[in-house]
Amino acid sequence: LVGSEMCIRDSGGSVGLSIFLAQPRALPAVLSVMEYHPFGSQAFFSLDKQDYLVVVAKAGDDPKSADELHAFYARHDQGVQYHAGTWHHPLLALNQVCQFLVVDRVGGEGINCIELDINEWQVQVEF
């Protein structure tokens, strides 16, 4: 599916597959946190034929405002892969609970999830 050289950076670990159950968000979706994973990429695929929202910001320094965020409407037949270090909001399911196949780094050293609270920005996404 995804080669380990695409998923893992320096600190070890291996590629893992899991199923994540995303709770639906009413629109407009209120954004609360951005996160990135410094040691591995992540890929997500909807298993329930449900569309979802994707919110990202450039890899690197913490985003400083909502102006640095980019939102996309993803169809159920589109997967998404975030390169290591790419800022993103956790999965935003629409309409109903949705299962996602997740390809992620497991194990290894170091903290692989860095979060940034963006509640004070009061960001809402609507399509």
Describe each model-derived feature in a short phrase.
Residues 1-8:
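Short, small-residue-biased leader/transition segments that mark boundaries at the very start
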Residues 15-54:
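Helix-adjacent hinge/juxtasegments
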Residues 86-113, 117:
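A short beta-strand-loop micro-motif that forms or neighbors metal/cofactor-
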